[in-house]
A protein has these predicted regions:
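Core alpha/beta nucleotide-donor-binding catalytic domains of modification enzymes
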Residues: 2-113, 123-135
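Aromatic-acidic/polar surface patches that form glycan- and anion
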Residues: 7, 28, 99, 137, ...
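Short, surface-exposed alpha-helical segments at coil->helix boundaries
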Residues: 33-36, 138-142, 305
Length: 351
């Protein structure tokens, strides 16, 4: 087994298959207590350092627990500061968001150790952002080239999960760094998997219904939203309906973006699953549905956790702890790179 260290690991969703390919994450760090608790449930043999890596005491704990035989560093700093779904969409706001400088804490861990392989993963827009470095503003690739080119091969890519056997469109920024003399090819692209291929075999469910299949239970939605979505076809937003329009309790029509209150499409990969995938009115969250005999559309609901596991490339019977709520599980999945994508990226590295 190759030993690894994981920073900003959240609940460890992205690490689900690493042990199967010979990578043992022996040390992890995460800020949020609930995510740490989830990680410990999923990976009881890994040591979790809980706390903010910017805190020197926490950082020193991480450094003290790195024994020197760890070959891989994985760093997936939080992306809220650069996500297109957040409020910060330009360089000025990026500069003022402290979350975007967590990469320098990862760099400090790299500088004080001797890893053979380093993976930095983030949202695709991370590639175009610039950081203050030696009196200049440089992108992360140029910073890494300046610091590490003598010892490492450094590559950057924007890879989309849909090209690697995952039924979800999810572009991610990947920076790979590996010692000269090692090899780490980029995995080959595969055919896309549609939503129909991924979850079309599962039984129809309406709001609140339980199929009896592991976590294939529909969330409860209010009757107003259900009515609007039963009159909305796949790929369409209920906000475009002329009559059956989403409304508040007081009857006022709800306003939103073109991709809110919107059904997914059967014959395309799923849109990227966000931390808010349990909200029927949020971005591209509603099941594609099936047209019924009366002309209405079934499955007026968000995807179930079972469906979400499949879309996220998690095991269908992923062992989530009993205390974890539906929304918390969705949040952890929405924060993470799909684990099958991580598996395929790491599977190509060689000594």
């Amino acid at each position: 087994m190759i030993k690894a260290v994981s920073l900003f690991t959240s609940a460890g969703v992205g690490e689900a298959y690493l042990e199967k390919i010979g990578i043992n994450v022996v040390l992890a760090n995460e800020l949020h207590p609930k995510r740490c608790k989830m990680y410990k449930h999923l990976y009881p043999n890994s040591k979790m350092i809980e706390g903010d890596i910017r805190d020197e005491n926490v950082k020193q704990q991480i450094l003290n627990n790195i024994k020197g035989d760890e070959r891989i560093l994985i760093a997936t700093p939080p992306c809220q500061g650069v996500s297109t779904l957040g409020k910060n969409k330009n360089q000025d706001s990026f500069n003022s968001d402290k979350r975007n400088y967590l990469i320098f804490d990862a760099i400090e861990i790299i500088d004080k150790n001797n890893f053979d392989f380093v993976l930095i993963e983030n949202v695709a827009r991370f590639k175009g952002m610039h950081f203050p470095y030696n009196g200049k503003h440089l992108n992360i690739f140029d910073i890494f080239k300046d610091k590490y080119a003598e010892s490492y091969v450094i590559e950057e890519h924007v890879l989309n999960a849909k090209d690697f056997g995952i039924a979800q469109t999810r572009p991610r920024y990947i920076l790979k760094m590996y010692k000269h003399g090692k090899e780490w090819p980029t995995p080959k692209k595969e055919n896309e998997i549609t939503l129909r291929q991924a979850i079309g075999h599962l039984p129809t469910l309406e709001s609140g219904e339980d199929s009896g299949i592991y976590l294939h239970k529909a969330k409860m939605h209010n009757e107003r939203d259900i009515l609007a979505m039963t009159h909305t076809h796949q790929g369409k937003s209920a906000l475009k309906n002329s009559v059956f329009y989403p409304r508040r309790k007081d009857g006022v029509a709800i306003k939103g973006f073109h991709n809110t209150y919107k059904r997914l499409e059967w014959d395309k990969p799923c849109h990227a699953r966000t931390t808010n995938s349990g909200n029927i009115g949020s971005h591209n969250n509603v099941h594609p549905g099936r047209i019924k005999d009366d002309g209405t559309v079934s499955d007026a609901r968000v995807l179930t956790l079972h469906e979400l596991f499949i879309i996220a490339s998690l095991p269908k019977k992923w062992d989530v702890p009993e205390w974890a709520t539906d929304n918390f599980i969705r949040t952890c999945i929405g924060e993470s790179v799909p684990p099958l994508m991580m598996k395929k990226i790491f599977r190509t590295l060689t000594e």
